[in-house]
């Protein structure tokens, strides 16, 4: 079965997206999630079906979540955050003098 879905991006976290049924808008998304997500920014609408492939999400999981809870939250890909948080002097230790 096909579903028309609206996809919103988070202003708080890069590459975090919220999928909702277009007909429901954001009505079924828990208020606590919206607080953590930030004010949703509409990215685009998409027709989803089991035959459609998504780049980073399992289409069956997305459709199941849309049916059961009314939304699907796509988390950002894992990063090597530890490198970004090291002090500058540690990052430069191996630089040539």
From Swiss-Prot:
Tree of life domain: Bacteria
HAMAP family named in the record: UPF0745
Matches recorded under InterPro entries: YcgL-like_sf, YcgL_dom
The name this protein goes by in its record: YcgL domain-containing protein PSPTO_3921
Record-annotated YcgL domain positions: 3-87
Transmembrane segments: none
Position of the signal peptide: none
Pfam family, one: YcgL
SUPFAM superfamilies named in the record: YcgL-like
